[in-house]
């Protein structure tokens, strides 16, 4: 091979080597540029997401049927946790627990976030069927809970009383005795059970029944049987039935009270009309 050909070949190899080195270097530089861009962008996005000034949870949407819960109840519950977080950082489970603990009349609450700045809260309240020991309420499942008095003052509900932890037992007795009385158009206004399981009832006409312990349904049936006779005697004497004590094997002890003035006048007018 001639010297000229050899020189030409070496020159081509040098050019090719320079090109390969240049390409490799360009590839490395490009990769480093991409990685740097990704890292910087990722850091920037993370900071942007955590920046409460960029994505604050500033809108509150409440759903669900509400009778006792006010918007401010929920707002104050959330604010008690401190400054609201961002869409990405706020833990909805913490808000849910906070509402359940601060608002005892809430049966169920679900909290979720909606992009970009909305907090949606769905509430389910307990539905009371009676008042329990004056300070609380009880629902159909025997759950007791409290509601601010000013929000329940207009509700007319039966009154139930019993030892602590006996709400289910009292509620069951109230239902059973109420169903029996309803057949004769009586309504239970109040039912109370003592720690010794002794029962006292108050009817819608304010007659008090003392049933004592045991055989409550049998004693209640005795009252229903005696009532027409007692009512007739009350009208004859111009009095009203105050209480009926049924803690006997048979019969009952009856307490009488004067008629209210308006009822007494009405009864006198009715008697005079019948005589004319």
Swiss-Prot record:
Membrane topology according to the record: Single-pass type II membrane protein
Pfam families: FtsQ_DivIB_C, POTRA_1
GO biological process: cell septum assembly; FtsZ-dependent cytokinesis
InterPro entries linked: Cell_div_FtsQ/DivIB_C, FtsQ, FtsQ_C_sf, POTRA, POTRA_FtsQ_type
PROSITE patterns assigned: POTRA
Known role: Essential cell division protein. May link together the upstream cell division proteins, which are predominantly cytoplasmic, with the downstream cell division proteins, which are predominantly periplasmic. May control correct divisome assembly.
UniProt-listed NCBIfam families: PRK10775.1
UniProt record similarity statement: Belongs to the FtsQ/DivIB family. FtsQ subfamily.
Identification of the protein by name: Cell division protein FtsQ
Species of the source: Shigella dysenteriae serotype 1 (strain Sd197)
């Amino acid at each position: 091979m001639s010297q000229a050909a050899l020189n030409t070949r070496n020159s081509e190899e040098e050019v090719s080597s320079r090109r390969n080195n240049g390409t490799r270097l360009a590839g490395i530089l490009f990769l480093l540029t991409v990685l740097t861009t990704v890292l910087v962008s990722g850091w920037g996005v993370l900071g942007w997401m955590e920046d409460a000034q960029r994505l604050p949870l500033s809108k509150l949407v409440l759903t669900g049927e509400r009778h006792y819960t006010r918007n401010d109840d929920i707002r104050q519950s959330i604010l008690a946790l401190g400054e609201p977080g961002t869409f990405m950082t706020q833990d909805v489970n913490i808000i849910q627990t906070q509402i359940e603990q601060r608002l005892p009349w809430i049966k169920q609450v679900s909290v979720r976030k909606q992009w970009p700045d909305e907090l949606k809260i769905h509430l389910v309240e307990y539905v009371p069927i009676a008042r329990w020991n004056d300070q609380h309420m009880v629902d159909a499942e025997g759950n007791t809970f409290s509601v601010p008095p000013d929000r329940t003052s207009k509700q007319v509900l039966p009154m139930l009383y019993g030892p602590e932890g006996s709400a289910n037992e009292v509620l069951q007795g109230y239902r059973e005795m109420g169903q029996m009385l309803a057949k004769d158009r009586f309504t239970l206004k109040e039912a109370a059970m003592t720690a010794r399981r002794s029962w006292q009832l108050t009817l819608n006409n304010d007659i008090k029944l003392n049933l004592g312990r045991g055989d409550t349904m049998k004693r209640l049936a005795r009252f229903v049987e005696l009532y027409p006779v007692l009512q007739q005697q009350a009208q004859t004497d111009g009095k009203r039935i105050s209480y009926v004590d049924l803690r006997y094997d048979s019969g009952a002890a009856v307490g009488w009270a004067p008629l209210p003035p308006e009822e007494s006048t009405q009864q006198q007018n009715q008697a005079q009309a019948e005589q004319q």
